[in-house]
């Protein structure tokens, strides 16, 4: 028994350790080994996907992925409309197009930011809470607020122009108040 217990202690030694040191200071570029037409992740026809916002749709029984459409270059002051996808397997996607457009330069949601979506069985509406970013806010303006848009069918969205959740109303910043994560409570 003692010999069996000592065997693991003698099987390794400092001579077995091989550490290869790399000189990373001369490396300036890493090239991907992936195929140029990488199809693992969704890529829109134009621009890029920003901040995916996944949501399981209990009505359609599929997943919806809302995202910030990033055109690069984006229009000055108004950017990141919310677009959407649907999928049942996270490998094949159907584009839903633009769901929630940016507001105008003078509106609170000139640029849109990340949000989250819930479905209400009570009124059969989808609710997407998102960040509204004001273009060039004055010192009295809130740079970022949480806003909401609703839809009866996940296709046609209506912005509620009376709902503004402002951080400074609750002791938070009026400049940095974004990316709401909304969930349904026990009360529905």
Model feature map: region roles:
Residues 1-4:
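Sec-dependent N-terminal signal peptides
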Residues 13-188:
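Beta-rich carbohydrate-recognition and catalytic domains
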Residues 8-11:
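C-terminal motif of bacterial Sec signal peptides marking the signal peptidase cleavage site
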């Amino acid at each position: 028994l003692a010999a069996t217990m000592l065997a693991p202690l003698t099987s390794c030694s400092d001579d077995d350790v091989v550490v290869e040191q790399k000189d990373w200071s001369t490396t300036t570029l890493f090239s991907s080994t992936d195929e140029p037409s990488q199809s693992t992740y969704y890529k829109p026809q134009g621009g890029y996907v920003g901040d995916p916002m996944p949501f399981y749709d209990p009505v359609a029984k599929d997943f919806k992925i809302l995202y910030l459409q990033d055109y690069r270059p984006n229009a000055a002051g108004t950017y990141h409309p919310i677009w959407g996808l649907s999928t049942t397997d996270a490998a094949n996607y159907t584009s839903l197009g633009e769901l929630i457009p940016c507001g105008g330069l003078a509106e609170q949601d000139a640029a849109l930011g990340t949000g989250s979506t819930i479905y209400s069985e009570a009124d059969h509406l989808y609710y997407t809470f998102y960040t509204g970013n004001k273009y060039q806010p004055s010192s009295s303006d809130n740079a970022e607020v949480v806003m909401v848009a609703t839809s009866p069918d996940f296709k046609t969205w209506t912005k509620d122009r009376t709902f503004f959740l402002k951080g400074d109303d609750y002791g938070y910043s009026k400049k940095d108040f974004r990316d709401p994560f909304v969930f349904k409570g026990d009360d529905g």
